[in-house]
């Protein structure tokens, strides 16, 4: 979908807070199957246009974006967060210090206008809830860098608030 029709979305969901996690998992599961609309669009595109050129152009765009983001993440967050080696895709998994929750961090960052996803929804096994995901497919490089800057500027505040909450103050 990122190569053929990046950003194709149909509809809007307003979900009660208590259902957000289940909804994200559900949406992720539905996204991994290919709808007839996408299949027909791909057939049309391949038969009417130069698919090879389009595919090559998209690969270059996303590779350049990925590499620039990778460098920026390492510059701003390297040594402060665990950066998981990417094994494909155009997203990044980062880990908070041990003992801190990505679910809490995702909510904390959402209030700062940065949308992240908790990493646990991408794993089959229970793991430490400290990893989160950054997806770069739809954002501009300026917005990606802005979001990384906000994450960098907010880490110490998040850690401090989490410690206070853990002490029950």
List the model feature ranges, each with a label.
Residues 111-112, 125-169:
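PLP-dependent enzyme catalytic core of the Aspartate aminotransferase-like
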Residues 1-60:
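Conserved core segment of the aminotransferase class I/II
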Residues 16-17, 47, 95-97, 137-139:
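Residue-level recognition of strand-loop junctions within catalytic nucleotide-signaling folds
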Residues 43, 56-70, 82-95, 105-108:
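Conserved glycine-rich beta-strand-loop-beta hairpin in the small C-terminal domain of fold type I
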Residues 100-105, 142-146:
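Short, conserved charged micro-motifs
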């Amino acid at each position: 979908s990122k190569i053929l029709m990046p950003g194709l979305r149909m509809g809007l969901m307003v979900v009660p807070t208590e259902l957000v996690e289940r909804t994200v998992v559900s949406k992720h599961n539905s996204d991994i199957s290919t709808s007839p609309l996408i299949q027909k669009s791909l057939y049309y595109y391949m038969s009417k246009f130069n698919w090879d050129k389009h595919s090559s152009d998209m690969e270059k765009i996303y590779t350049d974006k990925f590499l620039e983001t990778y460098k920026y993440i390492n510059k701003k967050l390297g040594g402060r967060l665990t950066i998981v080696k990417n094994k494909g895709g155009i997203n990044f998994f980062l880990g908070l210090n041990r003992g801190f929750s990505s679910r809490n961090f995702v909510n904390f960052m959402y209030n700062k206008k940065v949308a992240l996803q908790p990493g646990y929804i991408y794993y089959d096994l229970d793991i430490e809830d400290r990893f989160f995901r950054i997806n770069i497919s739809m954002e501009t490089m300026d917005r990606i860098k802005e979001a990384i800057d906000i994450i960098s500027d907010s880490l110490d505040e998040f850690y401090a608030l989490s410690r206070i909450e853990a002490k029950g103050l």
